[in-house]
């Protein structure tokens, strides 16, 4: 069952390891045609895809770097604004403290002035009431003294002018004795 080709090949005496020159030519032409198609059509398409991908990656990296730079600039701007806001808040707080201290000082001054005014009014009113009470007391003491003296003497001492002089003189003497007693 040996095939006829094998028998012929054995008969011719050709080496089976060395291919036929026509086969080599067909394989070389086929390979060259395949390489031409690959180089002419497939490689440019692959190269274009590769280049597009490289450009997309580089563009993405450039966009990322640009976005990072913008983010850094925005962050620096934000930090600057935040520092300015903190400075402004501190200034406003200090202004408010100063204003509050001024308001408290003014209120304290007004309260002190009002208290002094009320105290002086009260002192003046007390002095006026004391004088009024002293004058009324002198009149009542004089009237009682005249009535009592009239009862002791047994006659009426109703002469107003004369009795008033006596009472005034008595009260003046009494005031002098009290002043002298206080001075001692």
From Swiss-Prot:
Disulfide cysteine pairs (residue numbers): none
CDD domains named in the record: ATP-synt_Fo_b
GO molecular function: proton-transporting ATP synthase activity, rotational mechanism; proton-transporting ATPase activity, rotational mechanism
Record's bilayer topology term: Single-pass membrane protein
InterPro entries for the chain: ATP_synth_B-like_membr_sf, ATP_synth_b/b'su_bac/chlpt, ATP_synth_F0_bsu_bac, ATP_synthase_B_chain
Gene3D superfamilies in UniProt: F1F0 ATP synthase subunit B, membrane domain
Keyword field: ATP synthesis, Cell membrane, CF(0), Hydrogen ion transport, Ion transport, Membrane, Transmembrane, Transmembrane helix, Transport
Subunit structure of this chain's protein: F-type ATPases have 2 components, F(1) - the catalytic core - and F(0) - the membrane proton channel. F(1) has five subunits: alpha(3), beta(3), gamma(1), delta(1), epsilon(1). F(0) has three main subunits: a(1), b(2) and c(10-14). The alpha and beta chains form an alternating ring which encloses part of the gamma chain. F(1) is attached to F(0) by a central stalk formed by the gamma and epsilon chains, while a peripheral stalk is formed by the delta and b chains.
Its biological purpose: F(1)F(0) ATP synthase produces ATP from ADP in the presence of a proton or sodium gradient. F-type ATPases consist of two structural domains, F(1) containing the extramembraneous catalytic core and F(0) containing the membrane proton channel, linked together by a central stalk and a peripheral stalk. During catalysis, ATP synthesis in the catalytic domain of F(1) is coupled via a rotary mechanism of the central stalk subunits to proton translocation.
Official protein name in the record: ATP synthase subunit b
The organism of origin for this protein: Micrococcus luteus (strain ATCC 4698 / DSM 20030 / JCM 1464 / CCM 169 / CCUG 5858 / IAM 1056 / NBRC 3333 / NCIMB 9278 / NCTC 2665 / VKM Ac-2230)
């Amino acid at each position: 069952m040996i095939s006829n080709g094998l028998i012929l090949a054995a008969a011719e005496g050709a080496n089976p390891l060395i291919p036929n020159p026509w086969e080599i030519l067909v394989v070389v032409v086929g390979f060259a045609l395949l390489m031409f198609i690959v180089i002419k059509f497939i490689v440019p398409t692959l190269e274009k895809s590769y280049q597009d991908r490289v450009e997309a990656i580089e563009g993405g990296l450039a966009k990322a770097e640009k976005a990072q730079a913008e983010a850094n600039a925005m962050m620096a701007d934000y930090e600057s604004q935040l520092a300015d806001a903190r400075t402004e808040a501190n200034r406003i707080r200090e202004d408010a403290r100063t204003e509050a201290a001024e308001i408290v000082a003014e209120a304290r001054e007004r309260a002190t002035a009002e208290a002094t005014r009320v105290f002086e009014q009260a002192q003046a009113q007390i002095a006026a009431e004391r004088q009024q009470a002293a004058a009324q007391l002198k009149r009542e003491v004089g009237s009682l003294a005249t009535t009592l003296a009239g009862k002791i003497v047994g006659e009426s001492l109703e002469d107003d002018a004369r009795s008033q002089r006596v009472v005034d003189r008595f009260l003046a003497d009494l005031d002098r004795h009290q002043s002298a007693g206080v001075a001692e």
